[in-house]
Amino acid sequence: RRRQRQMCIRDRVNAYKESGFLPEWASPGHRDCMVGNNSASVVADAYIKGLRGYDIETLWEALKHDANSQLPRTASGRVAYEEYNKLGYVPNNIGIGQNVARTLEYAYNDWTIYTLGKKLGKPASEIDIFKQRANNYKNVYDPKYKLMVGRSDKGEFNPSFKGTDWSRDFCEGNSWHWSFCVFHDPQGLIALMGGKKEFNHMMDSVFKMPSRLGMDSRGMIHEMREMQVMNMGQYAHGNQPIQHMVYLYNYSGEPWKAQYWVREIMHKLYTAEADGYCGDEDNGQTSAWYVSVSYTHLRAH
């Protein structure tokens, strides 16, 4: 397994040397699919957890390059990186869809780049910009709704915002799914939403709301129907942006809720039948969630 991981990272070195960019959805090559700059998190995770046997300096240069570039006509690099670097978010009025999702993912990716750079001993003059940009998730938070909301290049939040709308500001989801996507700074997110009590209220609301199909600004996509069939409010485990959410209760002082919802998800949304997955498998992510949770559950007992 270790050798397989090494090969995956080495493949990224080769891809960068041959094409000038790291692949973000290699199926195959630089497929134009999904958002974010998550080669950064893959590389950082591998190195920080002790995996070696590849050219980390080339990858470091690749991460810095891709954070400030875009490969034309594909999702490799960062779409709208100039606006993101200038404004601290991707605006929703420049013809770039999924802008809130991109902002949240880029902020997380910036944190992973900073963390890797720190591990490599890179100077502050080189890495502090990524530490600063890791806070950019705060720039799409609208205190009026206590949710992440699209905003224009003038700084105006979307005036027709609805939290349940699967709008073009998000990727295959709505604001309730994406507003908790601050993987690197849960305490910062909790503070942003008004503290633990208010944060827990927002988390509880995800499960208490009706499983309404948010088709205010787009037509049906299969993820909507899957969420409705799951019947867990606005919790959409069939798609990845929200799969970590229940664990945030561990950071907000109510860990028993995390335990309850993890068990509910395991028992209700996974079966050994032909339709045993509750949505997209997406390169093994949905099954990996179950395997990881099952392992920790067994060890706890």
Q: Language model features by range: what are they?
A:
Residues V35-N38:
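Mid-membrane cores of alpha-helical transmembrane segments in multi-pass membrane proteins
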Residues Q4-D11, T296-H301:
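Conserved small/polar residues in nucleotide/adenosyl-binding loops
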Residues R10-A26:
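Active-site-surrounding "flap" and adjacent substrate/cofactor-binding loops of secreted or lumenal enzymes
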Residues A40, G50-N135, N139-L298:
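Active-site core of glycosidic bond-cleaving carbohydrate-active enzymes
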Residues V43:
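Catalytic cores of secreted/periplasmic lytic hydrolases that degrade extracellular macromolecules
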